[in-house]
Amino acid sequence: EPAWHAAKIVPLPSGGTGLPRGYLPALSCPSSGSCSAGGAYSDASGRTQGLLLTMVRGTWHPSTKLSPPANAGQDPGMTIGALSCGTAGNCSVVGGYQDATGNTQGFVAREVNTKWQGATEVVLPGGAAVKGQISSVHSAACASAGNCSSVGTYLDNASPISGVQGFTLDEVHGVWGSARQIAVPSDANANPFVAIGQVACPSAGNCSAVGSYIDTNNVTRGLLLSERGGSWQPGTTLALPGDANAFAGAALSEVSCVSPANCTALGTYTNYKGAVEGLTAVELHGVWTRGVAMKMPASAGANPHVFFYGFSGLSCPSVGNCSAGGQYLDSSDLYQGFFINEVDGTWQAASTLALPAGSRAAGRNGGVVAVSCRSAGNCSAGAAYLDGAGNYQALVVNEVVTVWRIGRRIALPNGATTVGVDGGVYGLVCTTRRSCTATGSYQSSSTNYQGFTVATN
């Protein structure tokens, strides 16, 4: 199994002081020794800038600032939402920023042969609000160099109140197009309040995305989206388990695809007892099956309040074989982390994240955040938990032949004693059996966070 080293601090661009709210969400490693990561940092003037990291041949290069779009405000508030690499050194990054008029806009930026280009504003669909816009690109997936798809949300110009709509946005042969409004299911509310979880693209122009919308009864429903041959299809509604509440509040947060039209999604819903449970859904040959309730650990409370962080907590190395992780509330009202495995097409009962000695709980800001599988039943994960003194710590956990081991605390840079409430492992990718990389953040002082990288080789 992989042996993890101590974490190393991420040196910030000149004048950088720290990471706002410890935000370093994005990591993509298309091959062993080649990774890109992204987040946000505060510059010397306290402005929020986009942060980019690139690993070449196993070595992290000095971090760089992502140049904001030309119409960005004085404080661009650059916030990277996701990053994906088609091949080593050829990636795309997406997110949101503040323009000079105070609107929040979406952006995209490309890395070409390890050189990051400046970010450009997303051209929103016709009918987007001109004033008071709040738009952002939430997720991106690149199937090959220069071929990516992304999903996000924006405000339309409906009166008297703008509606929250979703959009898709494709990069084809290195050129990003304009955003297109997602066609929501026919039972959607006039304001569908679209929320987007993730997109996954196993091949160029063939993607699946998940999220949620609100129907005419003000019930939140799971939203499923498919792109086939470069064309996005109208959204469909996830069918829920038989024990779902009439007001099930279903939402899908993560998706992973093994091949085009063969994907797995994770989410949550409320059952008829009022308990928030986890669910899995499978797309087979382009058809999404009814969601299936997760079986939580025996220690789960009557309402386990299942929660997924939505970064990279699901990994499917082959059809019918997945591993995932999240958080739940146990019968003692303590927040715990959990793992759940799909083996040869059958989801097993979830297991509790095993914590180091002296710890009782993962904590409200703890649990499993990132999962990456090299092969079926052989995975690694990043998590956070509360130590015996009540401080949050970062944890790496290895799964060997479908058995999750006890997690190992990450040794933080410069003698730091906690990752804080906003820190921990955000991204983790394993490219081979023994080669894994993780990124995250930790609390460096009472008011500041810094980034870290940690690896196995």
Predicted regions and their residues:
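Residue-level hotspots at or immediately adjacent to binding/recognition sites across diverse folds
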Residues: 1-457
